[in-house]
């Protein structure tokens, strides 16, 4: 383990304890139209807000990529239609009607863990560890910390 502000657990693993099979964190959809080699519009995801599946995964259930998993780089919603951008283009081309299961993603920050998953008790990071700005601060005569003995 490393001491870092972000969580080092994988979303849904034994340390994280989020159930990714819960319908709140999982959606089923189909490709409507391919916008680029790794970006497509999808049906079936109307109940999820933009960003819900960012950093999540897509498991292909039909088409040439059936049985493969791909990571989601971004999830947008435009005029009620979901747009998914994958981290990498799948091995085989995506075509309209390819079906998939998509699972929520996590930003690895304590705020996401609390608001999106209500799972702060299982957060595996150190959110209060000082950042680089604490190392770069120095005492000044006019500031609250002038360098005198406390």
Region annotations inferred by a language model:
Residues 1-150:
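Interface-prone segments of viral and bacterial extracellular assemblies
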């Amino acid at each position: 383990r490393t001491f870092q502000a972000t969580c080092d657990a994988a979303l849904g693993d034994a340390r994280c304890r989020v159930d990714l099979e819960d319908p709140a964190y999982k959606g089923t959809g189909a490709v409507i139209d391919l916008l680029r080699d790794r970006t497509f519009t999808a049906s079936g995801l109307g109940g999820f807000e933009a960003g819900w599946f960012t950093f999540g995964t897509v498991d292909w259930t039909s088409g040439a990529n059936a049985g493969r998993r791909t990571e989601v780089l971004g999830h947008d919603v435009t005029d009620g239609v979901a747009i998914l951008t994958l981290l990498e283009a799948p091995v085989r081309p995506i075509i309209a009607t390819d079906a998939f299961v998509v699972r929520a993603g996590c930003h690895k920050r304590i705020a996401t863990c609390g608001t999106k998953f209500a799972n702060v008790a299982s957060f595996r990071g150190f959110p209060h560890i000082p950042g680089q700005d604490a190392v770069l601060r120095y005492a000044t005569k006019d500031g609250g910390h002038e360098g005198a003995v406390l």
